C-alpha cells in the first residue's frame, strides 16, 4: 500500500517539478554506472508508464526519497510524525538486524545506522540533496550486495521517513539508545552461541579422530590376536597329517575364531569322555571302535599304522577328525552310518541312523567287517561315544546357521 501511494506521488511530482531531476543528476555524477543509467532513463522518458513499471524498486525509492526530502523542508510535521508513529509501532522483527536475510549485511547496516541520524539532521537543515546522496549511496551499496528484499525495503522506508525532521529524530533518540543496547546484547549472544558451536565442533572432531585412532589400534591388536590364535592352532596339531590342517583352515570355514571354537568344543568333549571312560561297558567300547573304523574308512585321512603308533598322536588325530565332522558339510551325513544304516532307514536323519546303528546293526558290522584289521582301535578310550559326536555336529550346524 505504501509503495503504491509513493509511486503515485512520485509520478505527479516528476511531471510538475524539475528540481528533483537536478538533484538526482548531481548525485548521479558521484555514483557508479547503474545510478547514471537510472538518471538517464529519468531524463529521456519519465512519463512513460511502462518504463517506470519495468524499473526495479530501487528507482522508485530513489524518487520517493528525493521528493520527500524536499517536501520535508516546506510542509508541516504532521504527516511525517504520523508515519513515524506507524513505523515505530511496527513489529520488533523489523528493528532487529537478524530479520534480514544476510547476517553480514545486518551487522554493517546496524553499525551504519548508529552513525547516520546526526548526519541526517544537519543535512536536512542545510541541503536536501545531501540526504538524497547519502541514501542513494547506501541503496547502491545494497543493490550491489543483492539484498533487496521486502524486509529491507520496509526497513529503509522507515529510516528515510525518520530522518526527514530534526525534532522527530531527537524524539527517537532515547528509543534508539535502548535499541542499540538491545542490538548489542543480541549480537553478543549470537557471537557467544557461534563460538560455543565452533568449540563443540572442534571437540567432536578431535574426539572422532581419537576414536578412529583407538579403533585402528584395537583392530590391529585384534589382528595380532587372531593371527596368534591361528598360529597356536597350527602349533597344537603338528603330529596330525598336513592335509587335515590345510582342509580345516581353507576349504571349510576360513574364520580362525570359528576353528578355534571348534577346537575347544572337541577338546572339551574328549576330556569329558576321558574322565568318564572308566565306567563304560564293553558294548560302548565296541561301538566307539566301530565308529572309529567307519570314520577312517570313509574319510581316508588317517591310516591304522598312524593311529596305533603312540598315544599322543592318537590324542591329536581325533581332535582333527572331530573338527572335520563339525565344520565340513559333506561329512555331516556320513557320521558312522553310510550304507549299513541307510539299508535300515533310507530316509532317516543323523540321529535316527545312529540310534538304529546302535541298537540293530551290530550283526551287520560283524558280518561285513570280518576282514578288517582291528589293530587300529587300540586308543579307543580317548574317543567320544557316537552320541557326543552327533550332538557336537548338530550344535555346530545350528551355530553356523546363526553365524550366517
Curated annotation (Swiss-Prot):
Superkingdom assignment: Eukaryota
Molecular function GO terms recorded: transcription corepressor activity; ubiquitin protein ligase activity
Biased composition (Basic residues): 169-187
Cross-link Glycyl lysine isopeptide (Lys-Gly) (interchain with G-Cter in SUMO2), sequence positions: 358
Tissue distribution: Expressed in skeletal muscle.
CC annotations in GO: chromatin; nucleus
Primary localization: nucleus
One example of a Gene Ontology biological process annotation: negative regulation of viral life cycle
Record key words, sorted: Coiled coil, Isopeptide bond, Methylation, Nucleus, Phosphoprotein, Ubl conjugation
PTM comment text: Phosphorylated at Ser-67 by AMPK. In skeletal muscle, phosphorylation is induced by exercise and seems to increase muscle contractile function.
Residues the record lists as Omega-N-methylarginine modifications: 347
Composition-biased stretches (Low complexity): 203-219
Biased composition (Basic and acidic residues): 1-12, 23-32
Region of interest (Disordered), residue spans: 1-50, 63-255
Coiled-coil stretches: 175-200
Required for interaction with CSNK2B: region residues: 202-226
Phosphoserine PTM sites in chain numbering: 66-67, 143, 145, 147, 327-328, 330
Annotated localization: Nucleus
Extent of Polar residues compositional bias: 87-121
Subunit-level organization: Interacts with CSNK2B (via KSSR). Interacts with JUN; the interaction is mediated by CSNK2B.
Function statement: AMPK substrate important for exercise capacity and skeletal muscle function. Required for normal contraction-induced signaling.
Annotated protein name in UniProt: Protein ARK2N
Gene designation: ARK2N
